[in-house]
């Protein structure tokens, strides 16, 4: 018999509905079937706007230190960041990605079997550490009425090659799953590189070139098709022909925009998971924001968080446990009896959690 695997998981609810969906996910993990032989130990950690207001730091050093020294993985809830400059504040999720070496943001978007509209089954792989998100901005000229600001957009060969390799690995993995017959949507493996090198020939040109080079790094990638899309054309095609895409790889900003847009293809940001992935650590994170308008009302949709837990478990090698979560969640959504208001229902976070757990144990 295989031994029970202990996972020490850092829980970072952060702000808004993060404080509701992360506890729901904890309950889910605590009640996974014994057959999976997983034991979770949880460490509660601070970050976010609320933490900044209390302590003056959005990401306490203690949080990073405990993640690095005590945790196998982490679950992040949601962050409420101001839209204007606040002295001393910097986004904790962006900082965590850099400090933990989480160079890839992986966001699967998949419609339910039998759902109306065109079938959607794609993954957006977003470079997580560079582009405009290096946050190197400055005011060049500060004369009232004539102010000029500029920002650095950094693209490196190393980071672009790494994210390209991740995209090819995911495409290869998805093809293996399709060949096993467990996917209802069949397509050839394809990596689509997103860029705007017709305008930004140096930065996006380097990203494009590096992603293409990544295919040559492993002979097993040779059977994977590759194409390219200019980012504005990609926006059009994503909404018109989502069934044409498999794995989409993009620089940070483009990937951020495309992945949120892709969520609309399946109905709600509350359904879409993501994982921030590094060489030795994964931090899952639902795509939705902190939703302050519904925070504290008990109606936050935990589905994206549950799927984020499943995605985290996939990257940690626990595919069977992940599959159980995906199946249980999909059944709740397909039946349509227990849905939160964002999906047209009247149920709350706890009711959704109860229904998912009931499916897992049946």
Curated annotation (Swiss-Prot):
GO terms for molecular function: homoisocitrate dehydrogenase activity; magnesium ion binding; NAD binding. Its cofactor is Mg(2+). NADH binds at residues 79-81, 198, 289-293, 301. It catalyses: (2R,3S)-homoisocitrate + NAD(+) = 2-oxoadipate + CO2 + NADH. It comes from the Eukaryota. Pathway: Amino-acid biosynthesis; L-lysine biosynthesis via AAA pathway; L-alpha-aminoadipate from 2-oxoglutarate: step 4/5. The keyword Oxidoreductase applies. The modification Phosphoserine is found at residues 81, 91. Binds 1 Mg(2+) ion per subunit. The keyword Metal-binding applies. Mg(2+) binds at residues 232, 256, 260. Its EC number is 1.1.1.87. InterPro entries: IsoCit/isopropylmalate_DH_CS (IPR019818), IsoPropMal-DH-like_dom (IPR024084). One of its GO terms (cellular component) is mitochondrial matrix. Pfam families: Iso_dh. (2R,3S)-homoisocitrate binds at residues 81, 97, 107, 126, 133, 196, 198. It is found in: Cytoplasm. GO terms for biological process: lysine biosynthetic process; lysine biosynthetic process via aminoadipic acid. Keywords: Amino-acid biosynthesis, Cytoplasm, Lysine biosynthesis, Magnesium, Metal-binding, NAD, Oxidoreductase, Phosphoprotein. Belongs to the isocitrate and isopropylmalate dehydrogenases family. This is Homoisocitrate dehydrogenase. It comes from Schizosaccharomyces pombe (strain 972 / ATCC 24843).
């Amino acid at each position: 018999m295989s031994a029970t695997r202990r996972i020490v998981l850092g829980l970072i609810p952060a702000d808004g509905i993060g404080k509701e969906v992360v506890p729901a996910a904890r309950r889910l993990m605590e009640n996974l079937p014994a057959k999976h032989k997983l034991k979770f130990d949880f460490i509660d950690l601070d970050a976010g706007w609320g933490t900044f207001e209390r302590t003056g730091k959005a990401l306490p050093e203690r949080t990073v230190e405990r993640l690095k020294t005590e945790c196998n993985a982490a679950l992040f809830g949601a962050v409420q960041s101001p839209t204007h400059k606040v002295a001393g504040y910097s986004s904790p999720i962006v900082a965590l990605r850099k400090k933990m070496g989480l160079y890839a943001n992986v966001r699967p978007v998949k419609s339910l079997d039998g759902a109306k509209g065109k079938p959607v089954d794609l993954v957006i792989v977003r470079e997580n550490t560079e582009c405009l998100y290096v946050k190197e901005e400055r005011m060049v000229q500060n004369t009232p009425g004539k102010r000029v600001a500029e920002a650095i957009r950094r693209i490196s060969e190393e980071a672009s090659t790494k994210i390209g390799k991740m995209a090819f690995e995911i495409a290869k993995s998805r093809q293996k799953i399709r060949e096993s017959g467990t996917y209802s949507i069949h397509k050839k493996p394809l990596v689509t590189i997103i860029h705007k090198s017709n305008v930004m020939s140096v930065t996006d040109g380097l990203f494009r070139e590096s992603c293409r080079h990544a295919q040559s790094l492993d002979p097993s990638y040779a059977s994977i098709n590759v194409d390219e899309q200019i980012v504005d054309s990609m926006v059009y095609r994503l909404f018109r022909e989502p069934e044409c895409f498999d794995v989409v790889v993009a620089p940070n900003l483009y990937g951020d925009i495309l992945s949120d847009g892709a969520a609309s293809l399946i109905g709600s940001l509350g359904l879409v998971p993501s994982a921030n992935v590094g060489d030795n650590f994964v931090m899952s994170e639902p795509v939705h924001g902190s939703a302050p308008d519904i925070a504290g009302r008990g109606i936050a949709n935990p589905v994206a968080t549950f799927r984020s837990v499943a995605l985290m478990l996939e990257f940690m090698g626990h595919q069977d446990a992940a599959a159980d979560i995906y199946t249980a969640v999909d059944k709740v959504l397909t039946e349509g009896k227990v849905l939160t208001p964002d999906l047209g229902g009247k149920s709350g976070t706890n009711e959704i959690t109860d229904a998912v757990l009931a499916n897992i144990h049946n």
